[in-house]
Amino acid sequence: MVGSVLVQRMREERDFDQVEPVFFSTSQAGGKGPRIGRDVEPVKDARDIAALKALPVIISCQGGDYTSEIYPRLRQAGWQGYWIDAASALRMKDDAAIILDPVNMPKIEEALSTGIKNYIGGNCTVSLMLMAMAGLFQRDEIEWMTSMTYQAASGAGAAAMRDLVAQMARVGRSAEPLLEDPASVILDIDRAVTETLRSADLPKSNTEFPLAGSLLPWIDKDLGNGQSREEWKAQAEANKILGRNGNAIPMDGVCVRIGAMRCHSQALTIKLRRPLPMDEVEGMLADAHDWVKVVPNRREESLAELTPAAVTGKLSVPVGRLRKLPMGEGYLAAFTVGDQLLWGAAEPLRRMVRILVDAGVKR
């Protein structure tokens, strides 16, 4: 799914005019390549080390298992090219940079100048949070932060998105006769919905538990200390992206999966290092890069612009509900939404290709 979005974005931005693409698959070798506006060779076997080794740059959207299997074999075979990856397997390695160029372009340039060859997309929630709050992070105005997330089904993969839609359809069918009867009692509708969500045959082979009309208050592995791995990533990855490994900003929160398709939302509590007027906060956020949009903290604008329905498919990362909290002048609330498949996954990879092309890497 991330690979499909990546190809779509590369077509839109005419990136394929700058490179000579070769497409690989673990399951469809020999098949026809994607449409990119010109002819391409048939898809090759993604486990063919010799074919992979011939390339100066490899972009992987196949997942961590593939990376763990193929990447070390490539390096052992003497491959010296650039590895760009959406998976988490290499993110925290010392010889890898996490890429989010609107936020950390100086760190990417430093990595290139020191010979780093591995450029890895960050966790989707972390990347979207940093895109929204870059203006404060870049000026070192944040002392600590918490993020309470509302994460879309897409973060769990295409199969989870299918589960969600199938669950919604099943719930709709169960309630439809009662909904069409004006005399029906709402508690009867509620009972029908609840029975459907609790039924053993509800489609949930990938979500494990009901997601439609519900939520999942745990994402990723249990670290054994009450924290999920998804929650751990906030501090670990964000500080690496920002280049603050020796002076980390504390970050934590609770990560929750909700019944949205592909947009992650986050409610943030920020402790500032010093009191700042709200107009300065909003100005810093708005000036950070071209894709952040500060939404005025008013009801109509918030409901119109700060929802997954409004943001899906857009590169814009809106941030709003900005206000001081009663705990003190240095405490700030914010709410942000972003497309998990764009800045949360494919876009940093696409832009890294252009960075390498601009740096003179061979086609």
Where are these regions (language model features)?
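A glycine-rich, Thr/Ser-enriched phosphate-binding loop motif common to dinucleotide/cofactor-binding enzymes
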Residues: 117-128, 226-236, 344-348
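General structural feature for long, well-ordered alpha-helical segments within catalytic domains
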Residues: 6, 70, 132, 211, ...
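N-terminal Rossmann-like NAD(P) cofactor-binding subdomain of oxidoreductases
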Residues: 1-206, 246-250, 317-318, 322-327, ...
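Glycine-rich beta-alpha junction loops
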Residues: 27-29, 124-125, 149-156, 203-204, ...
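Oxyanion-binding "anion nests"
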Residues: 193-255
